[in-house]
Design a protein with these regions (language model features):
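Conserved catalytic core of sirtuin-type NAD+-dependent deacylases
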Residues: 1-142
Length: 142
């Protein structure tokens, strides 16, 4: 079976209504990337980071995969397709794609602040006081 490797970015999900980071009026317009997308940013201001990603997670629940997502999933019938995405949404998965690597993490996953390996599926808002089984604060898997 022939292999196809796809590198996807913000453009594929923008078509579904996901706000991108670098557009005019984009998500980074009001925030420095290091303030909302780094462990150091979370340590400095966890409330900002949690609210930023809670808003993104809510937005994600209001959109659906678009034709491009479905076409890539459909290719799996005839090819060994691997998708490497810079996106943190789950639109590739919801369209039916299976072999996906998220370079920058995933909105619907969280992890303890002190553990890069333990990753937990998370659908709801994440708040201060949401802890793992060991009592460690959870943070977005971004």
């Amino acid at each position: 079976m022939k292999k196809i490797v796809v590198l996807s970015g913000a453009g594929i999900s923008a078509e579904s209504g996901i706000k991108t980071f670098r557009d005019s009026n984009g998500l980074w317009e009001n925030h420095k990337i290091e303030d909302v997308a780094s462990p150091e940013g979370f340590a400095r201001n966890p409330e900002l980071v949690l609210e930023f990603y809670n808003l993104r997670r809510r937005q994600l629940s209001e959109v659906n995969p678009n034709e491009a997502h479905y076409i890539l999933a459909e290719l799996q019938k005839d090819f060994d397709v691997h998708i490497i995405t810079q996106n943190v949404d789950d639109l590739h998965e919801r369209a039916g794609s299976e072999n996906i690597i998220h370079l920058h993490g995933e909105l619907k996953k969280v992890r303890p602040v002190n553990d890069e390996e333990s990753i937990i599926l998370w659908e709801d808002d994440l708040n201060l006081g949401d802890l793992d089984e060991n009592g460690i604060q959870l943070r977005p898997h971004i």
